[in-house]
């Protein structure tokens, strides 16, 4: 799967080195555009989430992550938060926008499962620009330099992303640059919501399965570079992107209270980053 609209909306790819690398440039993207979905093109049958390729009224194609799929709103919350954190840390991530789905959208689609999904997803969903012509990253063919690999491992340990493995790398090559996609399996604490403060300090043992861990020799250096970028101000602006519509699933907490939990989770995890850094270093040592 891929994402993105016109090339002009993204940094111009310029890496010609056989090792994949790019500068740790930060991008301020704290306001998401909105558009209305107009045409369902085809389903992208990946796992249980059933995203789709669709067109919006701005004329561009998007990979749509539906709020009615699998884990419902929690998946699009994780996708939005994880993607924008990755962008802040300097990684290439397709532009994310809010996509409004109305009752008439996709009515001609004959698949009953898809019809049920669309009915459950009326309102705001999340779209990623479609990167036409992109290919999946293959660790057996494309080598990653230690700095970039270490920073990606740090990102995924920070946001507790369990889904960047050899089986499913969730990275794309597009114009000789590496792009990160699919962060919907991050923040898995919100699926149980119990003891979230304790989970914020977790070592994240799933990092042992990370596809880039063998290349990540500079995880401490990555921590020193990336941790300061996760400022309180950025985190507050980030969680404020979450629409109320996605925050109605906890009857005990209001949308603002849920936003505060996500913000506090990120702040606590940042302050205790040495815990997950050590876990990643130990896991890598066990691979050698």
Roles of regions detected by a PLM:
Residues 18-29:
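Short, Lys/Arg-enriched N-terminal segments with co-localized hydrophobic residues
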Residues 27-288:
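Phosphate/dinucleotide-binding and metal-coordinating scaffold of catalytic cores
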Residues 7-19:
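Arg/Gly-rich low-complexity intrinsically disordered repeat tracts
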Residues 1, 11, 23-24:
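Short terminal hydrophobic/aromatic SLiMs and anchors at protein ends
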Residues 3-7, 28-29:
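Acidic, Ala/Val/Gly-enriched low-complexity intrinsically disordered segments
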């Amino acid at each position: 799967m891929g994402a993105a609209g016109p090339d002009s909306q993204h940094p111009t790819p310029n890496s010609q080195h056989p090792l994949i690398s790019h500068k740790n440039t930060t991008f301020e993207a704290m306001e998401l555009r909105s558009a209305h979905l107009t045409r369902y093109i085809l389903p992208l049958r990946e796992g249980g989430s059933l995203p789709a390729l669709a067109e919006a009224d701005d004329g561009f194609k998007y990979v749509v992550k539906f709020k009615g799929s699998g884990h419902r709103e929690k998946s699009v919350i994780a996708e939005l938060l994880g993607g924008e954190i990755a962008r802040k840390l300097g990684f290439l991530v397709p532009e994310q926008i809010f996509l409004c789905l109305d009752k008439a959208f996709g009515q001609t689609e004959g698949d009953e499962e898809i019809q049920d999904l669309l009915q459950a997803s009326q309102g705001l969903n999340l779209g990623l620009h479609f990167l036409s012509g992109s290919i999946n990253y293959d660790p057996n063919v494309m080598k990653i330099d230690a700095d970039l690999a270490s920073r990606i491992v740090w990102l995924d340990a920070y946001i507790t992303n369990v889904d960047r493995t050899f089986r499913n790398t969730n990275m794309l090559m597009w114009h000789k640059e590496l792009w990160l996609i699919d962060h919907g399996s991050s923040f898995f604490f919100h699926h149980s919501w119990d003891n979230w403060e304790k989970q914020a300090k977790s070592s994240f043992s799933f990092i042992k399965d990370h596809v880039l861990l063998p290349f990540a020799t500079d995880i401490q250096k990555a921590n020193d570079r990336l941790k300061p970028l996760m400022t309180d101000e950025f985190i507050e602006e980030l969680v404020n992107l979450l629409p109320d519509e996605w925050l109605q699933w906890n009857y005990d907490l209001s949308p603002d209270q849920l936003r505060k939990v996500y913000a506090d989770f990120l702040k606590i995890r940042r302050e205790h980053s040495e815990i997950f850094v050590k876990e990643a270093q130990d896991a890598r040592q066990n691979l050698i």
